Every structure is written in structure tokens, then in C-alpha cells.
């Protein structure tokens, strides 16, 4: 079984059936991660390249591990020391990679649409590791895999996304994916951090955390970037925490046993209280493991064999 597409650029373009296929394929991949010997030869002879124009630890490492566990060769392009610094365009870099026989490229770039440009330029599969404020599809898929694993599905679930919605590619991809799978999505944060057009994506908008969290099944907490405060988008980090930090008291407003997610890295004491981050309802460490499984599934479905 393979995805009937060359690339993974975003969840906006995926059907519910394709999302389900990815999540179903990730389950046996996670079983592989639980073995003493994690390597399988599925992608032996394939070359997977990571090309990150923005800093990343989790996503880049997760993709590289996923490729290695599947038997592929990997190469990481360090943009700070590559021809990119000499003015080489994205298209030229892509053509160079194609000439090397690359099978898949994972790209993270500050410019929205960069993965799509790359995908139009080369025959290799392109996977979006995050582009500007546009999408971060693999983060959303690992979030969804975690939800499905813990809660069994999506139909009728109430999911709150808490924090800086305006600048978050994680939020956008989660919204596209969750709404397609039948979940009710609520976004909550300061008015200055919620884009006015977000309701057009079929979400409910809240500016009060207590109202938004009532009766939800999942709370996905987004990282607050300190530079947003310097731009005057909220008065201070202390004020943000007072109104929007996920504390044990606010968590009690959700359904008993509600799941807590965070894409990382966390600002403890600002967007999430340490007691919540380390509590029994948090699946933050599991998200990291699930990220490797989901990325293994994607590489298999895009560049693996037909069987």
C-alpha cells in the first residue's frame, strides 16, 4: 500500500482516508520501535536527505532516525555551511540533490510554500518539515496518532488548541486534520494571537481559557515565543501565564482524564505548569516516540515498496 501522491506538503490537501491510512501504518511502525533490534530493511538502497533552513532538534532527528530504522541512507544538509550561504537558490540546491539520486527530501524553511516549490522542481518525494506559518503536517499527524492511540478515534471529540494560533503552523495542520476526522476544534488565546479568518476553517474561537476548556477531551498547548511579547502582542509573559497557562486548576475544567499534548520545546510556568507537563494526563514524551513511528510510516508510504 502506498499513498497515491508523490509528496506530503500539508494536511489541507489530504483526504480523511489518506490520514487514516497514515495513522494505521504508524501503529506497526511503533511496534518495531519497541523491539530490541529496531532496524528493518524496507528502505534499503534509498537516500533520504534532511534540509533544514531553520533550527530544529526534534523534527530533524526524528526524521533521520525514522529513515535509519527503515534501512535508508541519510544525509543532512547543514545550510549554515552549504552552498546556500553562497547564494545558491532553493531550485539549484534541489537539482543538485536530484542529481545525487535522492529519493526523499525533508525540508524546513521560513518561507511558506518552499516545500511545494521544491516538489515541483524534483522527482524525489518532498516532505514538509514546517514552512513559515503555513503547515507542519508531520507534527499534526503525530498529535493525531497520539489522540487515536489514547482515546480510540476522533468522531465527536472536543479538542482545544491553546496559545499563539496566529503564528502556529502546528495549529493550522492540526485544524485541517482534526476537522476532517470529525473532531470539534476550539482555539483559545489572546485576541492579538488569533487570526480573524480562523473561523473559516470550521473552528470555535475563544478568548477566555476557562470557557474554552470546559468539557474538552484533548488540550494541545502551543509554545509561546518570547519575541511575540517584545512586539507588543501581549503585555508580559507573567500576564499571559495568568490568563492562559494550563494549570492543574484549569485542567480540571476539561473532561476527567483529558489528554494534554505539547509540540515542544516547553516554556514551563508560562504556557504550561510543571505539574501538568509532568502529570499523568500528559502524553508529551509519548509524542516524541510517536513522531518517529509516524515519520517511518510516511517514508514507507511515499518511497517504500508496493507491498
Curated annotation (Swiss-Prot):
Binding-site list for carbamoyl phosphate: 58-59, 108, 136, 139, 264-265
Pfam family, one: OTCace
Biological process according to GO: 'de novo' pyrimidine nucleobase biosynthetic process; 'de novo' UMP biosynthetic process; amino acid metabolic process
Group of enzyme by EC: transferase
An example Gene Ontology molecular-function term: aspartate carbamoyltransferase activity
EC number: 2.1.3.2
Family listed: Belongs to the aspartate/ornithine carbamoyltransferase superfamily. ATCase family.
Biological function: Catalyzes the condensation of carbamoyl phosphate and aspartate to form carbamoyl aspartate and inorganic phosphate, the committed step in the de novo pyrimidine nucleotide biosynthesis pathway.
Protein name: Aspartate carbamoyltransferase catalytic subunit
Organism the protein comes from: Moorella thermoacetica (strain ATCC 39073 / JCM 9320)
Encoding gene (name): pyrB
Amino acid at each position: 500500500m502506498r499513498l497515491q501522491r508523490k509528496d506530503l506538503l500539508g494536511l489541507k490537501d489530504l483526504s480523511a482516508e489518506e490520514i487514516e491510512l497514515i495513522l494505521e501504518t504508524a501503529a506497526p511502525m511503533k511496534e518495531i520501535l519497541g523491539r530490541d533490534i529496531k532496524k528493518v530493511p524496507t528502505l534499503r538502497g534509498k537516500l533520504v536527505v534532511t534540509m533544514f533552513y531553520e533550527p530544529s532538534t526534534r523534527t530533524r532527528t526524528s526524521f533521520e532516525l525514522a529513515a535509519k530504522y527503515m534501512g535508508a541512507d541519510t544525509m543532512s544538509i547543514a545550510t549554515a555551511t552549504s552552498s546556500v550561504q553562497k547564494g545558491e537558490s532553493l531550485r539549484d540546491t534541489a537539482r543538485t540533490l536530484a542529481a545525487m539520486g535522492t529519493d526523499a527530501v525533508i525540508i524546513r524553511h521560513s518561507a511558506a510554500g518552499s516545500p511545494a516549490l521544491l516538489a515541483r522542481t524534483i522527482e524525489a518525494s518532498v516532505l514538509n518539515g514546517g514552512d513559515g506559518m503555513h503547515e507542519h503536517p508531520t507534527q499534526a499527524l503525530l498529535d493525531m496518532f497520539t489522540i487515536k492511540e489514547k482515546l480510540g478515534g476522533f468522531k465527536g471529540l472536543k479538542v482545544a488548541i491553546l496559545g499563539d494560533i496566529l503564528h502556529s503552523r502546528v495549529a493550522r495542520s492540526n485544524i485541517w486534520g482534526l476537522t476532517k476526522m470529525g473532531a470539534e476544534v476550539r482555539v483559545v488565546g489572546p485576541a492579538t494571537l488569533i487570526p480573524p479568518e480562523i473561523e473559516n476553517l470550521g473552528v470555535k474561537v475563544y478568548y477566555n481559557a476557562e470557557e474554552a476548556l470546559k468539557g474538552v477531551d484533548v488540550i494541545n498547548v502551543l509554545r509561546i515565543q518570547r519575541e511575540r511579547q517584545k512586539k507588543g502582542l501581549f503585555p508580559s509573559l507573567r500576564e499571559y501565564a495568568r490568563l492562559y497557562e494550563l494549570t492543574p486548576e484549569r485542567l480540571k475544567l476539561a473532561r476527567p482524564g483529558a489528554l494534554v499534548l505539547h509540540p515542544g520545546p516547553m516554556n514551563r510556568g508560562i504556557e504550561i505548569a510543571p505539574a501538568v507537563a509532568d502529570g499523568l494526563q500528559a502524553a508529551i514524551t509519548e509524542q516524541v516516540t510517536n513522531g518517529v513511528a509516524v515519520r517511518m510510516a510516511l517514508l514507507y508510504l511515499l518511497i517504500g515498496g508496493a507491498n
